[in-house]
């Protein structure tokens, strides 16, 4: 059993999350990457994606749904491998 303080456990956790991100639809992948990894604001994401017909609240809702989808994939993967998160 591996404790979560262990470096190998943290690496495994990161690999699982990254793998689950890759399984997301392209729009979700892009939005979550821009927001969480690149530190972009919602306004910056709207501009970068060239989305003229979406409001900040619309993007916020979309990001939330993408995040919920990612969380579900991560939970499923952890339970499939009998890991605790």
Regions found by a protein language model. Name each.
Residues 2-5, 47, 51:
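Short amphipathic alpha-helical segments at helix-loop
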Residues 1-33, 40:
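Amphipathic alpha-helical segment used for protein-protein interaction
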Residues 28, 37, 43, 49-79:
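DNA-recognition helix of helix-turn-helix
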């Amino acid at each position: 059993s591996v404790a979560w303080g262990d470096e190998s456990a943290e690496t495994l956790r990161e690999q699982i999350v990254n793998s689950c991100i890759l399984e997301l639809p392209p729009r979700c992948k892009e939005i979550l990457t821009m927001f969480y990894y690149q530190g972009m604001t919602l306004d910056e994401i709207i501009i970068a994606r060239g989305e003229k017909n979406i409001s900040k609240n619309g993007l916020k809702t979309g990001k939330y749904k993408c995040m919920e989808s990612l969380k579900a994939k991560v939970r499923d993967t952890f339970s499939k491998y009998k890991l605790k998160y």
